[in-house]
Each structure stands twice: as structure tokens, then as C-alpha cells.
Amino acid sequence: MENPIDSLLLQPIYLSVLSFFLNLVLLLILFGSWLFKKRVACEDTDAIMNEEFKHISFSYNKLVLICCVSLSVFYSVLSLLSCLHWHTNGWPFLDLLLAALTWGSISVYLFGRYTNSCEQKVLFLLRVWWVFFFVVSCYHLVVDFVLYKKQEMVSVHFVISDLVGVCAGLFLCCSCLWKKGEGERIDLLKEPLLSSAESSDNEEVTAPFSKAGILSRMSFSWMSPLITLGNEKIIDIKDVPQLDRSDTTESLFWIFRSKLEWDDGERRITTFKLIKALFLSVWRDIVLSALLAFVYTVSCYVAPYLMDNFVQYLNGNRQYKNQGYVLVTTFFVAKLVECQTQRQWFFRGQKAGLGMRSVLVSMIYEKGLTLPCHSKQGHTSGEIINLMAVDADRISAFSWFMHDPWILVLQVSLALWILYKSLGLGSIAAFPATILVMLANYPFAKLEEKFQSSLMKSKDNRMKKTSEVLLNMKILKLQGWEMKFLSKILELRHIEAGWLKKFVYNSSAINSVLWAAPSFISATAFGACLLLKIPLESGKILAALATFRILQGPIYKLPETISMIVQTKVSLNRIASFLCLDDLQQDVVGRLPSGSSEMAVEISNGTFSWDDSSPIPTLRDMNFKVSQGMNVAICGTVGSGKSSLLSSILGEVPKISGNLKVCGRKAYIAQSPWIQSGKVEENILFGKPMEREWYDRVLEACSLNKDLEILPFHDQTVIGERGINLSGGQKQRIQIARALYQDADIYLFDDPFSAVDAHTGSHLFKEVLLGLLRHKTVIYVTHQVEFLPEADLILVMKDGKITQAGKYHEILDSGTDFMELVGAHTEALATIDSCETGYASEKSTTDKENEVLHHKEKQENGSDNKPSGQLVQEEEREKGKVGFTVYKKYMALAYGGAVIPLILVVQVLFQLLSIGSNYWMTWVTPVSKDVEPPVSGFTLILVYVLLAVASSFCILIRALLVAMTGFKMATELFTQMHLRIFRASMSFFDATPMGRILNRASTDQSVADLRLPGQFAYVAIAAINILGIIGVIVQVAWQVLIVFIPVVAACAWYRQYYISAARELARLAGISRSPVVHHFSETLSGITTIRSFDQEPRFRGDIMRLSDCYSRLKFHSTGAMEWLCFRLELLSTFAFASSLVILVSAPEGVINPSLAGLAITYALNLNTLQATLIWTLCDLENKMISVERMLQYTNIPSEPPLVIETTRPEKSWPSRGEITICNLQVRYGPHLPMVLHGLTCTFPGGLKTGIVGRTGCGKSTLIQTLFRIVEPAAGEIRIDGINILSIGLHDLRSRLSIIPQDPTMFEGTIRSNLDPLEEYTDDQIWEALDNCQLGDEVRKKELKLDSPVSENGQNWSVGQRQLVCLGRVLLKRSKLLVLDEATASIDTATDNLIQETLRHHFADCTVITIAHRISSVIDSDMVLLLDQGLIKEHDSPARLLEDRSSLFSKLVAEYTTSSESKSKRS
């Protein structure tokens, strides 16, 4: 018995009544609004309205207006035809008449609208009405189809009316959600009042997407100019339009942050709250894409629903004239809707994903800016960069899949409904079969989450170590340790690869189950029909098969969806966990505005500790006051807490107790210089505008003018990463210049003078501290006692406490700590006095002679010549298409490519079995009940099941082969790339920002690990699938080739037209990622400096700008892809419709209805499959750019061999340690100027040689050449008669020892830092620690030699790090030792002890010392003085000091005069 409610709902008359009353209500509201406006109208309303309408944007308001007018005209015509031609009356006629009146009223209302507050409510109501209209029209259309299926008469004009209503309603609903360029919702009913000038300005900055009309957006024609440009030239980054302002990172970030903080009063960020804030920041795109996904899903099932009717029509069961063409039209319209909604869905989803990535990158960066140092020790730079480079990208990629879970539920529901209509009760078995498939995947999904989490942790560990190694590559090469650390990274990769292997094989299992699912579900349903004795007819079978084929897509995609859900969940958890870390305490420092207090710095009962859990605080009992304008010096032994005190004033050290107040703006000069990659000028300005006069004064005070003249591009020279092309002294003085230029109130100097020579140090102290900063508050840490007498207050520190405080003469006799420091300094001066003849020159004379000397050598060296190039070059970018060689090399990585043909064979076999099973079901089932089936039901199901099992087995084999091959290729690519990176020369690292390398090691490697194998497999699967479909269709009606051949040609042409622009957009997007990673890494390393200058907003703006650069390239790359896919799907849809027309036009009986139905079943997916194949091919090429970039690094020129077997030196080499240099010429690159100019000298074996000279004169370059870090351009160096160029690098570097200028420690333990090669016993290590004055410090630690060392040794002071480096050489005991500013960061007393240790342990060794402290080289046997890359003097110190005109004598005089004069003034 029929349900009465269903009967009621299906009566057209009741639908007409409902529609009539909805129209009537809206008319009454519009009439009431009109009356209200008449009462409150102003005199100038008409003028405003007319002016407003004059500037209405055609792309929005007029299209909506035209749509409403068209509907009014349409319903008017339809009502007249109903009355005059069809003789319809009653409610249907009244409904059409009132609809015409309603849409006419809306049109008049829109044309004459006003902009008052009351109006907004009416505008909102119109939007609601449009949604209702769309829903009611859809319901009308459904009723039409149901009535049609019941073979009841349906009026044609009703069907036409409902179709027009659905299309117009969809357009009006979509228009409600479109946005405008200024970041606000487009009000389709209201435009802002803009003058012509303002409109013009707005058009100049608005992106093409925001200016595009509705038709342009629907067809993606707004991308056509850029794609056309890509065919005319190679697209550069300046050719790509900007993002719309509402889509910029800044706009989205502040929305995201406000939602996150508003929802999180406790500052506790959970994964759910993070998801919620992400959704609210891009909700419009997500909601619109969800609506489009819903319409797409419904439209996909129109064809299966009508499949039985189509087969019956071909079989001769025709219900009315032209039924075939009506069916073809319905199929065609459904496919058009499917095409349009899918493309817009994907585009909007990816747009939302880009927005989420932007806000996450900015939020992670923002967190990095507020992260205290103790939190950073738990999360290294590599881990944080991984969050930004991998996890944020993964969440962005999830936008492809975010609607899939609920869409799958909808699709399964629709499929079960259609199956029920086709198979009756037998379809019920499909439901438990589907549930069983889902349950079978549950354990695999849980394993996937576990494997993914472990995979990301292991990736973090690898990236952490990679980042640390790249940062310290120079010291690794100097020590000959690079291959040892490479093996550590390969071990970490091996652990990662273990989890990766489990992950990909688990994914293969999921893949196999779900790919076999459609066959399993269909076999279950058909078997149930057999058991229930439900007759199987070909029409119903084909409807079921068509449903299963549509269901195949989401089911096949389900493994990837599950994988992405798991990966995204892990990434969200990791980011949420990171964002939950404690921020830097804001209440550590009480900040007062400039000039509000006489006290600049005041600490009362202060206790500070880097580690809250430590029983012994870092600083305790801190009590002192610093008045405005005071000079305060801080001194003490290594590790006494000097740098920590400055960090406490900056607010970097957590406060345990006490009060700290700071009045005014701060500037900070770190002990280890932090220099940004960029121009020298940019480093000095540091965000402030150029003031030329002040800028020149700063350069003069910092003694930088001479250095800038030497640099190839003066202050426009681009500094390499970490200032690699500058000397230590130059970096320090640029850092000082940066602080001076800020014109702050309080200056904090952390021992900046130790990195420069005595003359430069004295000049800086006089011109900076006593000159430009004479009226400023200055607090400086120093180990140089000669700079103490000028201080208004001296703080002497020991073990984290201030032991003495006062002026120089007040504390000189009041305690032993200060006396020890001064005594050591006096002893050093006495050593110098015993060597020199007492000559001391006047400084003015020295300066004058230096100027003459500089001018003369500038002429000799040709430094006025034009420079030939910058050290840091733009990132390499391939041009044109990705070459076949890249594909060939990539595929050959796994077993020489032998597995690839096997995968193709398995896939072809699977395709044949799949088509065969469906062909079998179609062939043996009768067209109608009247025809006797040729085989029994048991045979029918048995053969189908056997074919399905065989095809499932092929799926399993294919999945395993793809996983195995992809894993092998990714692993080999990783190994080859890293091997070449570690074997690259230092010139590569000098010219390549670390971010570029990390980008390849993280993002590009992730693509190779997880994305590329699946992409390759899908291309093969889709291509073979398409060939199979075309084969099936051609077998039925070969005439379709007439249509397919030109369509395929057109598709190929479109692909070729598109790929030029798309390829370059993808490359530019890949390149634009590196600056983001590099900026991130650079910021984390200099975070203390950035915070001290209050530069967080500027750096936040920089990361947003860099993120926007990537987003706009990715956005337009996505737009280009959808531009192509839309056109391909449109062509395929026309081809599909043409095929249907051929089938229905054929004479009855010519075409087998069952086979024709099978052909249509396969053809239903042809448009999507063909477009997806082309899209995947293009995306594969874009993804192959990652492989291309990694392969670039497998072709990096390597250093000379590590070992040359034929010329290996004896184990005792070098036995004497004699170094002979002949005509040595050195430059840092072929395009860079010469640094050393023809040096010739000899370092006698067993003697100690000191190398001195002004900052930047070439001292460190000479040492780098000795270790072959830089290869000579000409000349040679011989050690004990062996040319160092003739032996392997490892044999050379492992026989030499060096304490480098920049002390380096690696994450690990004290033991692993002293003995990374594990060659020495604990007793030997303890002996080395005692000799380098660190033994007692390490014994205090609970874990002794296993005490932890954090990333870059951040939990040890710079001086202690330098002592650890000294401990390494004491263990190694090489015959030749180089000290490159080895004691620059330690106090004089410790320096004297170390010098004594070196004299004792290296008495018979050749020792080369570079030092700015004259006391460190004065007792050398020989002194070599360099100036601008030339040897000026080379003799014993005594002989040089005898010659009062020698440059060395003048250097010593400057040092002693400066020190003694300051001591006397005290």
C-alpha cells in the first residue's frame, strides 16, 4: 500500500501551492520595505543611488540583476503559454504568474536599492530566499524524475521550469559566497561608493581573480593571460599577479590568531581548537567547496539512476517520442554540472589549503619569536623548521581530502539507494559488505597512524642533525669529520626508512583491500540476488555496475584519504604541542618608557636561572643600579655568568625572584656575531630608513670604510649565510654598526672587542663607547683589562654572583678575583715589555702612515677594479620541461628500472580481468525477463567471483611492487644527494643558503618518499584504464572514433599549451620555498638579537611577505591546473554526449543493448578519468621538479679525493712540521676577487709562528688554504716536502689540528664532542679536560662525561666552547697545530694558563697562532704580518721590535700604549 504522505509530497499541485505562498510572503516583505523607505527617504537619495549604480561592477551586481530579470521574463512567458497553449489553470498557473511578479519585483528592488541599515536585513532575506528557491527547485526536479520513473505523465513545461530554477538558484547561491578584493564579503546587492580615481587605484592592485566576472571564474578564464604569456616567454616571478588582499597571509593570520586566542583564554591550545581556528579563518572557501562537493556527488548518480531506462530504450521499450534524446540531454546536463562543480570544488579547497598553510607558517614563526631559550633546547631549529616545511604543507595538502569522509558516506548512501531500485532486496547484502570492508581497514588505519607518528619523529631527528651539521660544515671539514657525521645522518635516515617502509607497505595493504572492495561488494550483491531468486537483467546489472564504477573512485581514493587523515592528525598534534610551549616571560623585565626614570637598569635581589629545575640558579643575589649615561663593565672568568647577566637584562633568562627594571630602548651586540644574509647596508640599517649623515658617522666610528672599499660591491655586497665571506672582526664591527645606527638608550656589549685586533679594538672603544655613545647607557662585558679603567662601574663576577663592584681603583685592592684578572694582564704586558725595545709611536703618526700604506696597496692590488660577481648567487632554476633524463635517472634508481615493465604488465592484466568480469555479467544476463539466461545462476556468480579474485590478486602484486620500487628510489636518491653534499667544497656552502639544502632534505625528500610513487602508479593505471574504456566503446560503435580522435587531439593541444606556464609556476613555487626555510632558520639563530631590538613585527612581516610570494605562485599554479582540467572535462563531456547520440540514433537492432549499456557504464567515468590523467601527468611533472632539484645536488662538483692511494703519506707524516709556501694566490670563487696575492714564506718545523694583521687582511684565508678548505688559484704549499695538493683531503686534515675562530659544539655529550670518532679512553679525555681548564666544571655535572650538550652547545658559554675545542687538539696531539683566535672569548688569566699548556704539550710541534692579543703571539719564534693579502713582514718578534719602523712594532706599541695609558688613568 502506498504511503499517503509520499503521495501528498509527490502531488504537483501541492508543490505549486507551497511555491505560491513562498513567493507571496517575499512580495509582501518587499512591499513593506518599499513603504518604509518612502517614509525615511532623503532628498539626495536619488542622486546617491544613481551615482552608486553608475559604478556597479558588471561582474557581480549586473549579472545578478540580469539573472533576476531573465527569470521574471521566463516565468511571464511560461505563464502565458500555460494559459493560452497548454490551457493550464488553477494553482500551477497562479504559481507561475506570481513567480514572474516576484522576480520582477526583486529586479526593480535591486535596481533601485538604498544603503541604510534597514536595507541590510532585506538583503539578507533575499539571500535566504535564493537558498530556499534553489532547494525547492531541486525538490521539484526530483519529483519530476520520480513521476517519470513511475511512468506518469509529466508536463514538459514543468520540467523546463524546474531545470531553469535549479541552474538559476545554484548561481544565486554561489554568488552569495563570493568575496571582493578588499577582504570583505561581496555584497551582490551593494557596491561601495568610489570615485573614479579610487576605482582606478584599486584596479591596479587587485588580483585578476578578484576582478574576474562570474563566467570568467566558472571557466577559469582569468588564468588565460598568464598561460598565454607562458607560451610566449619563460615566466618570471614578476609576471605572476599578486594575491587578493583578503587572501594575503596578514589578513588571514590576524583572523586566525584572534579566533585562536579568543577561544583559548588559558593559552592552552588543543588540536581541536587549532582545527576550529583554521576553519574560521578560511570558512567561506570550505563551506563553498562543501556545497559544490554535495552538488557534484548528487550529479554523479544521475546516470546510474537512468541506466536501466537507457538499456530498455535501446532494447525497444520506448515510452514516448524522442525519449532517447531526452535521456541524452539529461546525461549531458548532469555531466556538465559534474564537471563545473568538481573543478570549482577542487579549486576552492586548494585555496583554503593555501590559506591554512600561510597562517600555520606565520603562527609557528610567531611562536619561534616568543620561544625562550630553554624551550628551544627541547625543540631544535631542525625540528621547528620541519613543522613549517613538512607539517604545515601536509595540512595544506589535506584540503584535497577534507570533504572525502562525509562525501563517501553520501556516495555509499546514494549507491545503496540506486542498488535497491535496481536489485531490490538483494542490494541489502551490499551494505554489510561495505561495512565489512571498512572494518577490515580499521586495524591498518591504526597502524598507519602509529607508523606516521614514528616516521615524523624520526624525520625530526634527522632534520635536527642535518641542520646542525650544515651549520657547522666548515669545522667538520677542518677536522676531517664530515664522513663520520654523514654516517650519523645515514643511520638516522636508516631508522626513518624503517618506519617509512612499514608505512608504505601498510598503505599497500589498505590499497589492496579497498581496490578489491567494489568487486567484493558487487559479487556479494549479485550472490544475494541469486539466493533470493531475484532475476538479474542486463539493464539492472549495468545500473549496478555503473554505480559500483562511480563508487570505485572514492573507494580507490580512500587509502590515500585515510593516510592523509592520519598524517594531518599527527601534524596538527605536533603543531598544537609546539604552540603550547611556554612563551618568553613578559614580566621578567619591568619596561619603562625613555626618559621616565633616572635609572637605566635596576636589579633588586634578582635570581635568574636558564633551567628552572636546577638547584643552583645561573645568577643569584643580583643587586645593582645603573644610572642614565653610565658606562658599566662586567668582567670575570670563563663561565662566571657575564653573558647570562646581559641576557637577564634583555629578559631572556627566566626570573626566579627579585625585580628588574629597564628604562628606554635597548640595543644588543652578541658575543657570537649574528649577520643576516643580505647586503651590508641592510644589516646595518636593520629596518630603519637611511639617514646618510648618521650612517656615515657610524661607519667611521666602527672603522668599516676601509673594509667596505675592499669588498667588491662596497656596502651593497651581499653577505653569505652567517657572514661567511667576512672575517670575524668584520662581522663583529658590522654588528656594532647595526646597534649604533638604531640610536637606542641602552647598549649591551657582550665582549665584542675580542674578535678584533688591538688597534681596531682601541679605535672602537674610543670612537664608539667614549664617542658616539658618551651620553648613552653602556653595559659591556670584556676580558680585556685595558678597557676597564674608563668604566663608571665595574662588576666582577664569579660562579653566578657579583663578588666585587665599584670603580677600577676602588676594587683593585679590595678582593682577589679582580686582582687575578689584572695580575694576569700585567704579566702579559711584562712579557711584551721584555721583548720590545720600548718604542711606542704616537697614534696620529700611525694613523697617517696606515692611510698612506692603505692607499699604496689599494693601487698595487687593483682594488679599484670592477668586481665580477657576488658570492651568494640566485638559486639555480632549470628552464623548459623536465627532461627525459630526469625521469630515466629517477626510475633507474630502483633495480635499474627493471621492475617498471613488470608493474605495467600486472596492471594490464588487472584491467583485462576487470573488463572481462563486467563483460561476462553483461553477456550472460538477459535483457528482459522474457529471455532465458544462457548459463545457470551458480555458473554466472562463480565465473564472476573467480575473475574478481584474480583481479584482486593483481592489485596486491601491483601495490607491493609500487611500494617496493618507490621506497628503493627514495632511499637511493637520499643517499646519493647527501653523499655529494658532504663531499662538496666549502665554496658550495658559502654560496648556498642553508635553507636551500634543508628544503631539498625535507620537502623534496618527502615528495620522493610519499607522493611520487603513487603519482607514477596512477598515471599508468589511468592510461591503461582509458585504453580499456576506449576499446570497450569502439567494440560497440566504432563510429565514436570520429568524435574521440579530434577530442584527444584537442586535449593534447590544451595540455601542451598549458604545460609551459604550469611548469615554470611550479618551479618558481619550489624556489620560493627556500627563502621561507632560510629566513626561518636565520631568525631562530638570531632570535635574541631580534628581540633585543624589538624587531619582531618587522621580521613577522618578512615571513608573511615570503609566505605570500609562495602562496601567489601556488595559487596561480592551482588556477592553471583547474583551467586545463575544466577544458579537458568539457571536451570529454561533449565526446560522451556525441557517443550517446550515435547510440540512440542507430536503427533498432543494430546495436546490442547490453554491450551498449556496458560501453556507457565505462564512458561515464571517461571525462573525469581523462582529465585526471592529464592533470596527474602535469602534477607528476611538477612533482618531478623535486627530483630534478635533488638530482641537481647529485651533480655538485666534489672536493678532491679524500684518499689517493698512490700518494698516501706515511703514518708518521708530518714528522718535522715544516711548511713551505710558494707564490700562493687564493680567491673564494672564480667570479670573486683575489684575497691572497702571491705569498711566499716558510714556517720552520717545531717553531711557533704568530700571524698578525688588521681585520680582513687574509689571516684566516691562509689557514683555510692550508687545510684546503679553499683551493689555491696558483702556487703551492708543502708540508715536510709533500705538496698538499698531491695527497687526499682526509690524509691532510686528519694529520693537522686546529682550534677555529668560531667555537663549535654538537648536540650530544661532553664525551662525543671531545672524541666524536671514539678513539680515546675516558682517562685520556679527563686529562685533556684538566689541561684545558674544564675538568672541574665537568666534574660538577651529575652525568660527568655524559653531561648533555644542547644544539650548537647553547647550554655552554662561548668561552667554554672554545676550551672544548682546545681539549680536542690536546687529545689529537698532531705535529702541526693551528690556533685561529683560539682564546679570543676567554679572560686573560685563563689565556695565560692555556698558553702555558700549549707550550708544555706542543713544545716540539709547529704551532701557527692567529690572535688579536699581542700577548698570545709575542713569545712566538716567528711573526708573519699580513696586510690586504700580502706579506709585509716575516721575522722573529725580537728583530721586528728592534726595527721601530716595522708594522709589527707599531701594532705592539698601540696595544701596550693603549693598555698602559688606561691603567695609569685609573
Swiss-Prot record:
Protein name (Swiss-Prot/TrEMBL): ABC transporter C family member 6
EC number(s) from the headed UniProt entry: 7.6.2.2
Catalytic activity: ATP + H2O + xenobioticSide 1 = ADP + phosphate + xenobioticSide 2
Gene3D superfamilies according to UniProt: ABC transporter type 1, transmembrane domain, P-loop containing nucleotide triphosphate hydrolases
Membrane topology qualifier: Multi-pass membrane protein
Species of provenance: Arabidopsis thaliana (Mouse-ear cress)
Bilayer-spanning residue ranges: 16-36, 63-83, 91-111, 128-148, 158-178, 286-306, 322-339, 400-420, 425-445, 512-532, 890-910, 937-957, 1026-1046
Lineage: Eukaryota, Viridiplantae, Streptophyta, Embryophyta, Tracheophyta
Gene (UniProt): ABCC6
InterPro entries cross-referenced by the UniProt entry: AAA+_ATPase (IPR003593), ABC1_TM_dom (IPR011527), ABC1_TM_sf (IPR036640), ABC_transporter-like_ATP-bd (IPR003439), ABC_transporter-like_CS (IPR017871), ABC_transporter_C-like (IPR050173), ABCC_6TM_D1 (IPR044746), ABCC_6TM_D2 (IPR044726)
